[in-house]
């Protein structure tokens, strides 16, 4: 059976760095980003939320769960792609063929119990707010066509509140909490050693 590793934490916490570290231990896996499951801005729910990207209802949670469940059952999916510049889902999708290990990352992947129940190893990246904000600012301006003013406004109006309301409380579900994210060499070493040990004991880990 396919095993799923879930990596969560606030925006800019260093989830991608941890994924890269895992890739040194598990050479073959598919990566599912929850970001691709954002609803398009034109959806009814977004009008209700006033385009709040930091609320669980901003995601197509039913499709996200359906796809993870299919991957868990070793079935292929067609993952959506999200356009962050135009804030809508692209017309094309990506065919994802499951591998023995699937890594899923996103800010709210531990919020729903049905999704948590599909994840075999839950990792929470705990990084200071100021560091996360700086990383988010750099990313959104360089890769998502955002202005400095718009990123700051979003952070103050929804992102900060959304983190404390929805994301941070999910730490209690984590099997492993990594402070400082990808810069915590000792924690990443422990994680890598753990995965290597499991790999020696099982052909599919876990």
Curated annotation (Swiss-Prot):
CDD domains (alphabetical): UMPK
Pathway participation: Pyrimidine metabolism; CTP biosynthesis via salvage pathway; CTP from cytidine: step 1/3; Pyrimidine metabolism; UMP biosynthesis via salvage pathway; UMP from uridine: step 1/1
Enzyme class: transferase
Localization per Swiss-Prot or TrEMBL: Cytoplasm
Chain positions recorded as ATP binding sites: 9-16
Gene Ontology MF terms: ATP binding; cytidine kinase activity; uridine kinase activity
BP GO annotations: CTP salvage; UMP salvage
Keywords: ATP-binding, Cytoplasm, Kinase, Nucleotide-binding, Transferase
One Gene Ontology cellular component: cytoplasm
The keyword RNA-binding is assigned to this record: no
Keyword Hydrolase: no
Catalysed conversion reaction: uridine + ATP = UMP + ADP + H(+); cytidine + ATP = CMP + ADP + H(+)
Main location: cytoplasm
E.C. numbers: 2.7.1.48
UniProt xrefs under PANTHER family: URIDINE KINASE
NCBIfam families the record matches: PRK05480.1 (NF004018), udk (TIGR00235)
Family from the record: Belongs to the uridine kinase family.
Name of the protein described by the UniProt record: Uridine kinase
Gene source species: Borrelia turicatae (strain 91E135)
């Amino acid at each position: 059976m396919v095993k799923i590793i879930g990596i969560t934490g606030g925006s800019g916490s260093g989830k991608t760095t941890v994924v890269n570290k895992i890739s040194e231990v598990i050479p073959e896996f598919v990566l599912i980003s929850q970001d691709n499951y954002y609803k398009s801005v034109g959806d009814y729910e977004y009008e209700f939320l006033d385009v709040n990207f930091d609320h669980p209802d901003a995601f197509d949670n039913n499709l996200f769960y359906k796809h993870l469940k299919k991957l868990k059952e070793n079935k292929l999916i067609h993952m959506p792609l999200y356009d962050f510049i135009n804030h809508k889902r692209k017309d094309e999708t990506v065919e994802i063929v499951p591998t023995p290990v699937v890594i899923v990352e996103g800010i709210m992947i531990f919020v729903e119990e049905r999704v948590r129940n599909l994840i075999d190893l839950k990792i929470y990246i705990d990084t200071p707010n100021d560091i996360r904000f700086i990383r988010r600012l750099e990313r959104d301006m360089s890769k998502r066509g955002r202005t400095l003013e718009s990123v700051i406004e979003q952070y103050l109006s929804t992102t900060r509140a959304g983190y404390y309301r929805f994301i941070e409380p999910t730490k209690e579900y984590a099997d492993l909490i990594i402070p400082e994210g990808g810069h915590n060499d000792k924690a990443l070493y422990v994680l890598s050693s753990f995965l290597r040990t499991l790999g020696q004991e099982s052909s599919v880990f876990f």
